[in-house]
Amino acid sequence: MLYLREDFQKAWEGQNPQDVVETMDGEVYRALEARRTYRFELNGNGFFAKVHGGVGWMEILENLLHFRAPVLGARNEWEALERLHSLNIDTMTPVAYGETGSNPATQRSFLVTEELEGMITLEDFCKPWNKTPPPFLLKLAMVKKLATISKTIHNNGLNHRDYYLCHFMMPDVLSPDPDNLTFYMIDLHRAQLRTETPLRWRIKDLSGLYYSAMDVGITRKDLFRFIKIYTGLPLREALTQYESMWQAIEKKAQKLYQRMARKLPSNS
């Protein structure tokens, strides 16, 4: 499959798009054995390219042995972006996508998206909150926004698998109206799509989000607000009906927090 927006059709006319992205110079943000992410410019505009090489049979088998779906290339993220746009969830804008080869171990692919300019991650935005709490209405609006996004994607068969505050971006200049927030979901290369999101993957996403918010002054009331919106139920009913899920989320988030704390330098 190949998709090129009109400006990329003109820029890459007569060339093999996969070869173009594999040989293009840019500011490298991440370089792994089978995936490279870099920034480049075209016609004065910024873009990000994720270029995937073949992952190899060992990587595929390792994932299957652990009952995980292997990420073979850019298709995951391309399809996740399509799903998010259909749900009116703000995210990256794809401008070019291609996939070459039918062998899953050697398949090559790429995805190019528009740069999100003037943004800050929610993780960085919320870091000062533990010492300097935000305005109540802003925090309330952000909790509502995250709960609504989480409910929407999970109820429509999408789970992120790396669902942390750092994978949401927002404008670094806030709207004066707290209820007019815009969050952009990013880094969807491991996302999964189904007709329904299984419980285990809801737990993984929500425990990741909770873990990433533990050091920003999240209160019990904030959690309750999130739960009410996510379930669409009165609080008591939501806590009772999904008690085992909330317990699993709490346990998994605490375990992740403790594991990551052990990895930090002792003087952190």
Language model: regions and residue ranges:
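Hydrophobic residue at the +6 position relative to the catalytic HRD Asp in the kinase catalytic loop
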Residues: 163, 167-174
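Short, solvent-exposed loop/turn segments that connect beta-strands within catalytic domains
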Residues: 102-107, 173-181
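N-terminal presequences and immediately downstream first alpha-helices
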Residues: 1-16, 40
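Catalytic-loop of the protein kinase fold
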Residues: 155-165
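Conserved ATP-binding subdomain of kinase catalytic cores across diverse folds
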Residues: 14-122, 151, 155-156, 245, ...
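AlphaC helix of the protein kinase catalytic domain
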Residues: 121-133
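C-lobe/activation-segment region of protein kinase-like
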Residues: 180-254, 258
